[in-house]
């Protein structure tokens, strides 16, 4: 398995029309989860992926499993929990594409993920372990599971990819900054938004982040995503500006995960740092043009067509 990831995937109810939830009566049922999004994005780009999690032994849990499996991602690491329910969220889109989410996930099956759910076999055969800052703040057992996965990855020389994915709603008034910084410092590939960088390190300037994380730290590749402004990618010796890929943004949720999938696919294919950044930018941009987290994710063939048809900067 090329990529292994772990975290919660919820059932997401999406109104068919824009407006406040109080006025909605017609919803689509989809899935939402940063880690499974990345796994699905990578799978669409031609790479194998496995998702580790827990879901309730309920209809929503079955829907989540079927949906992830239908995208080609292995769910061999998913455990059914007969005592806790599958998490649920609602998405609301207002005028101007202002999107907000409401969670009903406290005490969910996935919040009981623990080191016992992580096996040597799952990690040692992987080429990349991908984690986010969402999972470790869900519960103490989830935090321990994340650290156990990293411990195994380091032991088997599996590179770790980490996206802070800061969700202050999940912090519940607690300060998890040091936790997220510690996890980021253990990553080989650190993929974060500019606002997250400012929150964690007091700066979004790529030169300072490069010095702090790549030269003084152990991060091999750093990507700082900045939405419509493009991205900066760097190593200890390179710092490259990635121009934004032109798109018409309809729904930005899931775009960061799509960038991650594209960037990591480049790594798996032995691409240069600049190429990894460009692939990530294209995948992230295209994901915003369709409503839903994963509906706009590119296939390997679609990505190749877009790259071959663009100006030199994207070839």
Segments from the language model and where they lie:
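Conserved phosphate-binding/catalytic region of the ribokinase-like
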Residues: 3-4, 151, 205-315
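Short beta-strand scaffold segments in enzyme catalytic cores
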Residues: 40, 88-92, 230-233
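Short, electropositive alpha-helical surface patch
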Residues: 59-73, 153, 177-187, 247
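Structural alpha-helical scaffold elements that stabilize or flank donor/cofactor-binding regions
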Residues: 121-122, 182-183, 215
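Short, conserved phosphate/pyrophosphate- and ester-handling motifs at nucleotide-, phospho-/glycolipid
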Residues: 42, 193, 256
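Glycine-rich phosphate/adenosyl-contacting loop at the front of the ribokinase-like
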Residues: 1-74, 97, 294, 315
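Conserved N-terminal subdomain of the carbohydrate kinase-like
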Residues: 48-133, 304-315
């Amino acid at each position: 398995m090329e990529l292994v990831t772990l975290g919660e995937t919820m059932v997401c109810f999406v109104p068919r029309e824009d407006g406040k939830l109080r006025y909605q009566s017609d919803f689509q049922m989809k899935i939402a989860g940063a880690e499974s999004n990345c796994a699905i994005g990578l799978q669409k780009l031609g790479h194998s992926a496995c998702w580790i999690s827990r879901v309730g032994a309920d209809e929503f849990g079955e829907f989540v499993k079927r949906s992830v499996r239908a995208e080609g991602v292995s769910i061999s690491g998913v455990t059914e929990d007969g005592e806790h329910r599958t998490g649920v969220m609602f998405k609301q889109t207002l005028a101007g594409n202002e999107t907000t989410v409401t969670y009903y996930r406290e005490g969910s099956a996935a919040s009981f993920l623990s080191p016992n759910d992580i096996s040597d076999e799952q990690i040692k055969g992987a080429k990349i372990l991908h984690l986010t800052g969402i999972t470790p703040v869900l519960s103490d057992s989830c935090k321990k599971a994340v650290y156990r996965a990293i411990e195994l990855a380091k032991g088997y020389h599996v590179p770790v990819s980490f996206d802070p994915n800061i969700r202050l709603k999940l912090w519940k008034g607690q300060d998890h900054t040091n936790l997220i910084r510690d996890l980021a410092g253990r990553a080989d590939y650190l993929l974060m938004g500019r606002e997250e960088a400012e929150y964690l390190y007091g700066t979004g300037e790529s030169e300072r982040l490069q010095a702090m994380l790549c030269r003084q730290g152990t991060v091999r590749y750093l990507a700082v995503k900045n939405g419509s402004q493009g991205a900066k990618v760097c190593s200890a010796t390179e710092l490259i500006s990635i121009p934004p890929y032109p798109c018409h943004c309809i729904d930005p949720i899931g775009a960061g995960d799509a960038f991650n999938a594209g960037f990591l696919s480049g790594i798996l294919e032995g691409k240069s740092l600049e190429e990894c950044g460009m692939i990530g930018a294209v995948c992230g941009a295209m994901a915003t043009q369709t409503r839903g987290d994963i509906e706009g994710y590119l296939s390997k063939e679609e990505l190749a067509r877009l790259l071959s048809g663009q100006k030199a900067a994207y070839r």
